[in-house]
């Protein structure tokens, strides 16, 4: 099987290099002009890759090794327990915003703002200004409680199901936000987009069962649309205002409260990584 992975297009002709899925160079157009080229020496760069805990892990530097359990520490047990290999990709959307990529990640790292900013959307579902926090190296886990968690008060602990009654937010340092949302999984892969004041993110939704029926598709479409509306109409306008304030130079620094440990940890990890 061949796969087109690189192409250069000009008004008067098209040049397309063909590579195997393995990365080996398969063919060169007008190969007579490259008669001395050894195709075996001009394949794509090989990167370390591993499938573990239902996820695909890639290191962007050739020659390095991957040890997921060592890197993720105790969070590996969480990933294994989620049985992610049973989940199914439903949809991915790409968003752009006029703010630094770290502000996108910040959006998920405190519940301080829920009762005010998300009064009609998330506040009826999740408790505001209440969350647990755990760090594992530069990575982190923050768990917000759903209002339904009160139903566990009289249940034996053996019957507790935390996933059903919480939103479990992980940051796989530095730029992946991973959220277990009761009945589905969200991932946010966030990147700079040209300069420090712009960002691009790929938002994916995964479901525990394939969405094959029309009712299932309507249900997951509603979930995805609610997610998009919440971040684009509530979170991002505020965050983009924060970005404008940063750019104006009116503040030399910002202060995180004791009720925002995930934010403090994330920015401390960024600072340590770039020293």
Question: Where are the language model's segments positioned?
Answer:
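C-terminal catalytic domain of Rieske-type non-heme iron oxygenases
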Residues: 48-51, 55-275
């Amino acid at each position: 099987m061949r796969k087109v992975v690189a192409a250069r297009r000009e008004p008067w002709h098209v040049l397309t290099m063909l590579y195997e899925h393995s990365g080996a160079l398969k063919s060169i157009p007008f190969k007579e002009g490259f008669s001395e080229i050894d195709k075996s020496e001009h394949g794509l760069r090989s990167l370390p890759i591993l499938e573990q805990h239902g996820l695909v892990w890639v290191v962007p530097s050739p020659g390095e090794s991957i040890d997921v359990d060592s890197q993720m520490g105790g969070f590996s047990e969480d990933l294994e327990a989620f049985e992610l290999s049973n989940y199914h990709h439903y949809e991915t959307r790409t968003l752009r915003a006029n703010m630094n990529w770290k502000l996108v990640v910040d959006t998920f790292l405190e519940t301080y703002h829920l009762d005010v900013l998300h009064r009609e959307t998330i506040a009826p579902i999740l408790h505001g200004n209440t969350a647990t926090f755990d760090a594992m190296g530069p990575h982190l886990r923050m768990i917000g409680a759903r209002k339904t968690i009160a139903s566990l008060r009289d249940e034996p602990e053996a019957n507790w199901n935390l996933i059903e009654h919480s939103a479990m937010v992980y940051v796989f340092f530095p730029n992946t936000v991973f959220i277990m949302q009761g009945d589905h999984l969200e991932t946010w892969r966030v990147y700079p987009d040209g300069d420090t004041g712009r960002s691009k993110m790929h938002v994916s939704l995964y479901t525990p069962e394939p969405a094959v029926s029309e009712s299932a598709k309507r249900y997951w479409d509603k979930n995805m649309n609610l997610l998009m509306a919440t971040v684009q109409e509530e979170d991002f306008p505020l965050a983009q205002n924060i970005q404008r304030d940063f750019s104006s130079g009116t503040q030399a620094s910002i202060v995180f409260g004791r009720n925002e440990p995930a934010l403090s940890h994330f920015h401390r990890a960024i600072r340590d990584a770039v020293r």
